[in-house]
A protein has these predicted regions:
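C-terminal ends and interior cores of transmembrane alpha-helices
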Residues: 84-97, 300-313
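Extracytoplasmic
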Residues: 10-45, 62-66, 151-152, 243-250
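Extracytoplasmic gate region of multi-pass secondary transporters
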Residues: 26, 30-37, 220-281
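Helix-to-loop junctions at the C-terminal end of transmembrane segments
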Residues: 62-75, 277-289
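Hydrophobic core of transmembrane alpha-helices in multi-pass small-molecule transporters
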Residues: 20, 89, 100-116, 236, ...
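Cytoplasmic helix-loop-helix junction between adjacent transmembrane helices
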Residues: 106-142
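Cytoplasmic membrane-interface "Motif A"-like loop-to-helix N-cap segments
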Residues: 71-83, 287-298
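Helix-loop-helix hairpin linking two adjacent transmembrane segments in secondary transporters
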Residues: 144-193
Length: 334
């Protein structure tokens, strides 16, 4: 692990920052401002959830094509474009007054933040650090956990200080000011790494024509494979339930009479579970492979759902339900 960090710290830090600053497009970030957004746009909980779901679904459909850009565009240029796209989404949401601008703003946040920035980070780790893909993906993915630990408290403080609209604008400015120079520095000389990857890829494909586990699959091949459809329910149920819970967290806090500021401060406990899960799963993936872990992915989340109705205090809700939920959460695994 230490050798990996010493030799590949630039690429690992790039992946970490991409996941960390994907926060404005993540549900935990947007939902903390949902009360103010609903009030400004005169939407109920259900109506805002419908808008959010529609924008997220549109983003998922577009990802079928936009996700392929990672294979076609220079990583440095693409990453900078994603940062600006996310910043534009923050700007549009900050001035939204109706359904159209709200949908557009949320769509851009979900597409560039939750979708492409996170996907770019994970793809870079797996693609260029193949022999340490588990540990590298875990280290880069820790950006999400750290973001979850500190962003809610910062966002709540920013909300109380400058209001929700200015909070989005401040987020956009900081996003560009920090990420653009960081990407230019951390991916300096990346072209040589990518050329080496292409050379190795062509050699592997030529040697593994009869081995479906090693060669690169095309999209039509994946769609025709029956095991893909058996895997989809387990894979999609986790983000579906997790996003639904996080999206309505403000409503849950209000319903149970808890303090939003205390709730936000307890995200750090949640993040610690995420970090631990990432590190353990990273080692397991590198040692045993990802396939043996698949049958166990949804079990902790199922236990957490059983315990949710009996969590009476904010502390035990975080300790039991959210910790178990996050073990199954796809963002906590390589």
């Amino acid at each position: 692990m230490l050798h990996l960090i010493r030799t590949e710290w630039r690429l690992l830090l790039f992946g970490f920052l991409m996941t960390f600053f994907s926060a404005p497009g993540q549900t935990f970030f947007i939902s903390l401002l949902s009360g103010e957004i609903r009030q400004a746009t005169h939407l109920s909980d259900g109506e805002f959830a419908a808008v959010y779901s529609f924008a997220t679904l549109c983003s998922a459909v577009v990802m079928i094509w936009s996700g392929a850009l990672i294979d076609k565009i220079n990583l440095q240029k693409l990453s900078i474009a994603l940062v600006f796209g996310l910043a534009v989404g923050c700007g549009i949401l900050s001035i939204s007054t109706g359904i159209v601008s709200l949908v557009l703003g949320v769509f851009l946040l979900r597409q560039f933040g939750q979708g492409l920035m996170y996907l770019t980070s994970a793809t870079a780790m797996v693609r260029y650090l193949e022999h340490n893909r588990g540990k590298s993906t875990a280290l880069a993915g820790m950006g999400y956990a750290v973001s979850e630990a500190i962003m809610p408290s910062i966002l709540v403080a920013l909300l109380l200080w400058v209001g929700w609209r200015n909070s989005w604008q401040v987020t956009a400015v900081f996003l560009i000011a920090i990420m653009v120079p960081a990407i230019l520095y951390l991916l300096r000389g990346h072209r040589q790494r990518h050329d080496l990857y292409l050379t190795q890829l062509s050699e592997v494909d030529s040697q593994s024509l009869g081995n479906p586990l090693k060669r690169q699959w095309t999209r039509p091949e994946v769609i025709r494979d029956k095991f893909f459809y058996l895997f989809i329910p387990a894979l999609t149920s986790q983000p579906l339930m997790f996003t639904g819970f996080i999206f309505h967290q403000v409503h849950l806090v209000e319903t149970k009479g808890w303090s939003l500021s205390v709730w936000a401060s307890l995200f750090i406990m949640y993040a610690l579970v995420s970090v631990g899960t990432k590190m353990v799963s990273g080692f397991l993936v590198d040692r045993y492979g990802a396939i043996p872990m698949v049958p166990w992915l949804s079990l902790p989340m199922g236990v957490g759902l059983v315990l949710l109705p009996v969590t009476l205090t904010i502390f035990w809700e975080v300790v039991f339900f959210r910790s178990l939920f996050h073990i199954s959460d796809p963002t906590s695994r390589p």
